[in-house]
Structure formats: structure tokens, C-alpha cells
Swiss-Prot record:
BP GO annotations: urea catabolic process
GO cellular component assignments: cytoplasm
InterPro entries per UniProt: CobW/HypB/UreG_nucleotide-bd, P-loop_NTPase, UreG
Entry protein name: Urease accessory protein UreG
Lineage: Bacteria, Bacillati, Actinomycetota, Actinomycetes, Mycobacteriales
Homology family: Belongs to the SIMIBI class G3E GTPase family. UreG subfamily.
Gene Ontology terms for molecular function: GTP binding; GTPase activity; nickel cation binding
Function: Facilitates the functional incorporation of the urease nickel metallocenter. This process requires GTP hydrolysis, probably effectuated by UreG.
Length: 238
């Protein structure tokens, strides 16, 4: 699908849309954010490969000036091309997922219209820093991905993505010995700042299926399926 464009102008971060009320039967929207190079696109690819035989899903990526992440997913044939689309955000990647989400909403509408019925849409943010989060008007739940390359201090530094995401993923754990990162420290500090919200430590090298993340996604899908059976606006499990 063709890329959707926005102007990328900065906006007041205090303004956000109300939390979206998912209508029964609508696809679950999961946001996947995190810094550049943390492994967001590789995680999206892994989830698509595991879920594509059991669910109807689609992917929306956000890149600053290119469609590189969407192109990567198409090249690796994780889903049919028509189920992958991109938003080009301009110079401020967090704007498109938090402050002015119009282009992302339009792209989601196009995916739903082109691929009915969808069960799940994965929305990948452009690479940003630890302050980037999704608008609650855009997604239902969000995953924030960091990796061990920044050292074991990253969870301790916090930030909205680390602290408040519905699932924190510490990626590339196989590299921890090479960079001197203590996974135990990362897990402990994440638990402290996240106050009960789950954290998953993964290595896509050692576990290409991203098993703990996959299990969490299935839990979210089960929660909305249960809500749909009762005909209520979904309450997503955290």
C-alpha cells in the first residue's frame, strides 16, 4: 500500500485524544515503540511469522523519510504486501504516534478496508528516545522495546516508555556478556520502576519466536475475544 504522509510539525505534548473505546469486532491495535536499533522491526517480523497462520493481521510502520521498515517486512514476506503499509512522519517521529495521529488513523482505516476482517494490527513507531509513547486514541496497548547495548542502566533511567508501557521488552539479551550488561540488574530495575507491569527479556537469536512476547500478545487477544463475547467495549488485560 502507498505511504501516508504528514507534515511532522511539533505539537504540544500535553494534548492527547481520549482513550479509544474499541468496538466489538474491531481489530486489536498494539503499538510497538522504542529507540532506533532496539529491534522493533525484527520483533514485528517474528510476531507476524508466528501469528499469520492463526490470525488475520496487518502491520503499519512509521519512518521519518522512507518506508524502510515496511520494505524490510515485505522483502522477508512476513505477510502479503497488501497487509503492510507505512506512514512517513517527517522530522518528528513521535508526533505521528502521539500528537497528530491522523495519518496513522487513516492508514489503519485503509488496512481494515482492504483486508477484512482483521484480528490484529501491529503499529510500529519510528525510532525515537525513551520519552516516545503512543496516543491512547491510536492503540489499545503498547510494547516498548529497549536492548542491552545501552547498558544495564537503561531501565533505571525510566522514561514514559520504560515505565508505563503495557509490556517492556529487553531485547538482544545474547549480547549482554559482550557489552557488560547485567540482565539481573535490568530485570530488577525494570520491576522497580514499572510497579507490577510485565517485562520480557528476549533474544531473537536464541528464540526466534519471541516466546514471552508472543504469549503476552495472545493474552491480549484472548481478553478482547472474551469481551466481544459479552458484547462489551473491551477491557484489555494488563
Amino acid at each position: 500500500m502507498p505511504p501516508h504522509l504528514i507534515d511532522g510539525e511539533p505539537h504540544d505534548h500535553a494534548h492527547d485524544r481520549p482513550k479509544r473505546q474499541r468496538t466489538p469486532g474491531e481489530p486489536l491495535r498494539i503499538g510497538i515503540g522504542g529507540p532506533v536499533g532496539s529491534g522493533k522491526t525484527a520483533l514485528v517480523a517474528a510476531l507476524c511469522k508466528q501469528l499469520r497462520e492463526e490470525l488475520s493481521l496487518a502491520v503499519l510502520t512509521n519512518d521519518i523519510y522512507t518506508t524502510e521498515d515496511a520494505d524490510f517486512l515485505r522483502r522477508h514476506a512476513v505477510l502479503p504486501d497488501e497487509r503492510i503499509t507505512a506512514v512517513q512522519t517527517g522530522g518528528c517521529p513521535h508526533t505521528a504516534i502521539r500528537d497528530d495521529i491522523t495519518a496513522n488513523l487513516d492508514a489503519i482505516d485503509d488496512l481494515i478496508a482492504a483486508n477484512p476482517p482483521l484480528d490484529l494490527i501491529l503499529v510500529e513507531s519510528g525510532g525515537d528516545n525513551l520519552t516516545a509513547t503512543f496516543s491512547s486514541g491510536l492503540i489499545d496497548v503498547q510494547i516498548f522495546v529497549i536492548d542491552v547495548a545501552g547498558g544495564d542502566k537503561v531501565p533505571r533511567k525510566g522514561g514514559p516508555g520504560v515505565t508505563y508501557s503495557d509490556l517492556l521488552v529487553v531485547n538482544k539479551t545474547d549480547l549482554a556478556p559482550l557489552v557488560g550488561a547485567d540482565l539481573g540488574v535490568m530485570e530488577r530495575d525494570a520491576a522497580k520502576v514499572r510497579q507490577g507491569r510485565p517485562t520480557a527479556l528476549i533474544s531473537l537469536t536464541d528464540d526466534p519466536a519471541a516466546t514471552p512476547v508472543l504469549a503476552w500478545v495472545r493474552e491480549q487477544l484472548a481478553a478482547i475475544a472474551e469481551a466481544d463475547r459479552h458484547g462489551a467495549a473491551s477491557g484489555i488485560a494488563h
